[in-house]
Amino acid sequence: MMAAASSPEKLLQLQEVDSSRAGSRILSPILGSSSPGLSHETSQPICIRSPYTDLGHDFTTIPFYSPTIFSYGGPSISECSSVHQSLSASLFWPSHGRVGTPITLHCPQGRSQQGQSAQTPWDSVITTSKSVRRRSQESEESMVSSGGKADLHYCAVCHDYASGYHYGVWSCEGCKAFFKRSIQGHNDYICPATNQCTIDKNRRKSCQACRLRKCYEVGMTKCGIRKERGNYRNSQARRLTRLSSQGKTAEPKGITGPAEGSLNKPEKPALTPEQLIERILEAEPPEIYLVKDAKRPLTEASVMMLLTNLADKELVHMISWAKKIPGFVELSLVDQVHLLECCWLEVLMIGLMWRSVDHPGKLIFCPDLSLSREEGSCVQGFVEIFDMLIAATTRVRELKLQREEYVCLKAMILLNSNMCLSSSDCSEDLQSRSKLLRLLDAMTDALVLAIGKTGLTFRQQYTRLAHLLMLLSHIRHVSNKGMDHLHCMKMKNIVPLYDLLLEMLDAHIMHSSCLPHQPPQQDSKDQSEVPAPLHSSAGGPSNTWTPSSARAGGESQ
């Protein structure tokens, strides 16, 4: 009051206002009648300059807006102490009949206050809203950087979407497989043009010579394999893990989910028959080419050389195909080896029938090798096997076998090949056998679903299922004939066998001659006589195993 009296301007102190004026003229927003701060201690006298009173100025309500109107995420006005103090009841006009302590309004500030930086009641709200907006922008930027196209790569050869980091560069599955075939086999490709063919997504198969040349130009090397490959699926999984961890850290500590234990240890859900068929279709190996043309006329040695070379290449892809069958790698290592050793020729023969179904009277061993009955007659004892294969292929053509049915039958041949070999009573073998039976049941359901898609009646579906299963017995019979013939060719030293093919042949003969009452010591002795480990792939040891090493690995586990 002393400072107000010393002011050159005339101030008027109001003690009481008419009730009709006080009810409609409010100088600040009303937070509520029960708002705290109505005590006399927080009230100050109100000083209004005389010109305002002389002119009869009309004081209308001053509007205050909530921060939420401006999209601020700060605290409410009632939670802010500075704003709450400035909006106390001391700013209101006194009600009629009550003489309250006068409130000071429009009072001139002292020099000490003028020197300080002016702070408004909204400073804390604006600061809070800015920090909230900054955190939201940072979270959006992190989400974009983690879940955007940062992990998307293109093939350096054909510019298709890359599936991973293969042979030293980012490449797609097609160019990776092509380069792998080229460095493993013959790569004496010849360009029909000027060695300047365009290699892109649509024309990458037009010229093998220019495609291989571009593979070397972009930096693909035989030894350029990373230990931790940049697989696109793994990067997606890591990205989802980061996003889930960010969501967990942003969640309040006091709030927990109802099934926190189930989230930490999720159970692997079983695949539906539809999903199982899709996975098996994706696991199909690529087409294999001999690259070199067969010299005519064909001889017994040249035909056997071509067939054994092709079979050795197919065995490499067969191992990779088997590992992609859902649930196969969950079996014991010994069972995985036994299954492949007992069914490899059956798998090759059903693939041969599938490729030859549209070519009556011929067997299509690969896209660049087809033989007729007359051409196969140059090999001693091969005509009988050729006729059996032609008859089985004719039966497949009569049944109009669909691709989904074919892949299911092929997987069933793999899983049903050594049902009678597991005679051990140890817990690990019994557990692996139970897994194998569950896999067979799932594969049978997938085959039934594939048959149901043909649009037949239920009775016709049952009949078709029986015909398809009876076809497997014919394939096994032809496989046994082919195994005996291949063993005779080996004993006569007509053609040198490759390492992987030789091991598979010896292992199959050993299993077929094994008696049920044979002691386990003798069995382990026979297993140790199998040839040395085989390195079938330049990409790594994923396609390499021996029966002896497999058993040693199983015992160590």
UniProtKB/Swiss-Prot annotation:
RNA-binding among keywords: no
Annotated region described as Modulating, given as residue ranges: 1-154
Cited Pfam families: ERbeta_N, Hormone_recep, zf-C4
Compartment annotation: Nucleus
Highest taxon of the lineage: Eukaryota
A GO MF term: zinc ion binding
UniProt region (Disordered), positions on chain: 240-268, 513-557
Residues covered by the NR LBD domain: 272-508
PROSITE patterns the record matches: NR_LBD (PS51843), NUCLEAR_REC_DBD_1 (PS00031), NUCLEAR_REC_DBD_2 (PS51030)
DNA-binding region(s), chain positions: 155-220
Main location: nucleus
Zinc finger regions, NR C4-type: 155-175, 191-215
Compositional bias per record (Polar residues), positions renumbered to this chain: 539-557
An example Gene Ontology biological process: cellular response to estradiol stimulus
Entry GO CC: nucleus
InterPro entries: ER-beta-like_N (IPR021064), ER-beta/gamma (IPR028355), Est_rcpt/est-rel_rcp (IPR024178), NHR-like_dom_sf (IPR035500), Nucl_hrmn_rcpt_lig-bd (IPR000536), Nuclear_hormone_rcpt_NR3 (IPR050200), Nuclear_hrmn_rcpt (IPR001723), Znf_hrmn_rcpt (IPR001628)
Keywords attached to this entry: DNA-binding, Lipid-binding, Metal-binding, Nucleus, Receptor, Steroid-binding, Transcription, Transcription regulation, Zinc, Zinc-finger
Its biological purpose: Binds estrogens with an affinity similar to that of ER-alpha, and activates expression of reporter genes containing estrogen response elements (ERE) in an estrogen-dependent manner.
Family: Belongs to the nuclear hormone receptor family. NR3 subfamily.
Notes on the domains: Composed of three domains: a modulating N-terminal domain, a DNA-binding domain and a C-terminal ligand-binding domain.
Subunit structure: Binds DNA as a homodimer. Can form a heterodimer with ER-alpha.
Protein name per Swiss-Prot or TrEMBL: Estrogen receptor beta
Organism: Oreochromis niloticus (Nile tilapia)
Gene: esr2
